[in-house]
């Protein structure tokens, strides 16, 4: 199955959701290339770069999207499949 490169931006409005967000990211550690957090007073931003199959990426973003108090946006690069 083809692997794709992409990124996800996670906006955490409810800091109580942070442990659940971290658990989801840990479960998908095998596709995560880079993770960077930007803590602010009222919210937190997390940027993640990943490489995985569309199924793996869908699992990651789907699980994140079901967490209350966060917003998730993802993007995949077109035509940059990896072996």
Regions of interest found by a model, annotated:
Residues 1-83:
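Long, contiguous binding/interaction regions
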């Amino acid at each position: 199955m083809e692997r794709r490169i992409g990124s996800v931006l996670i906006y955490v409005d409810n800091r109580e959701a942070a442990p659940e967000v971290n658990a989801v990211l840990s479960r998908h550690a095998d596709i995560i290339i880079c993770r960077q957090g930007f803590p602010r007073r009222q919210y937190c931003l997390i940027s993640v770069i990943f490489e995985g199959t569309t199924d793996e990426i869908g699992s990651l973003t789907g699980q994140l999207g079901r967490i209350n108090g966060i917003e998730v946006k993802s993007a995949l690069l077109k035509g940059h499949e990896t072996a």
